[in-house]
């Protein structure tokens, strides 16, 4: 009798797992707020909380930049967070924190988001890497409303990333910290953060996945009056551009860097070349 019950429970569990996987696949191929999408979410209501929270997590990731979809994703993720067991709640917390960062400038849920982010550390058990990511996402959220809190969060993220072998997250955290210093117009500190990010990038196995930030480094140096160094980084930017769009939207910046060095004729030559490209439909910012 006991063996039969165990067999039935095991069979039921497999069916629930298979149904969850199927619903998740179909959600990823559907459009949020469509009747088909809503129907798939409703079909998860008969699943145990463990599986339903996974379905809601996937549903909450399927939003675009439309505010209506973000609002609906927020509903899915908050419900997933409410019912999720510990080994799913951490993933939901990260996704909801990321979403709040997307909503911050165009939604009315700022206070709700602050309460949520403030409570997560005492409610959720993260791995070290997840915790670092949480503080990074928190800093992204706070950078628009509380610069001091954003600095504290990114510093917590950096302290956690330093204990990990994966440097991709640490690079992104230094870039975010550089952005925060830029808001304060503290360009020496900003460039120091970019330098550290670049040092990590050079030895990272993820260097092909990290979006280059040479333009930001050059802009920071230009604000410090270090035009010659800025020009070197703008040249690195140019190397990344296809030959058909040489200079591209960086023509003005490169020309300003040459002008700052006193090479005014060279700057004029670049701008004249940019104007010719504009006439051919190639360059739009000169």
Feature locations, PLM:
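Single-residue signature of alpha-solenoid repeat helices
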Residues: 36, 72-73, 109, 113, ...
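Position-specific recognition of the canonical hydrophobic site in helix A of tetratricopeptide repeat
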Residues: 28, 64, 105, 136, ...
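Residue register of alpha-helical TPR repeats
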Residues: 18, 54, 91-95, 133, ...
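Structural signature of alpha-solenoid helical repeat junctions
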Residues: 51, 69, 88-92, 128-130, ...
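Residue-level recognition of tetratricopeptide repeat
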Residues: 25, 61, 98, 102, ...
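Structural motif corresponding to the intra-repeat A-B loop/turn of tetratricopeptide repeats
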Residues: 30, 66-67, 103, 107, ...
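N-terminal leader/linker segments that initiate helical-solenoid repeat arrays
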Residues: 12-78, 82, 86-91, 95, ...
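Eukaryotic all-alpha helical interaction scaffolds
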Residues: 44-47, 63-64, 80, 84, ...
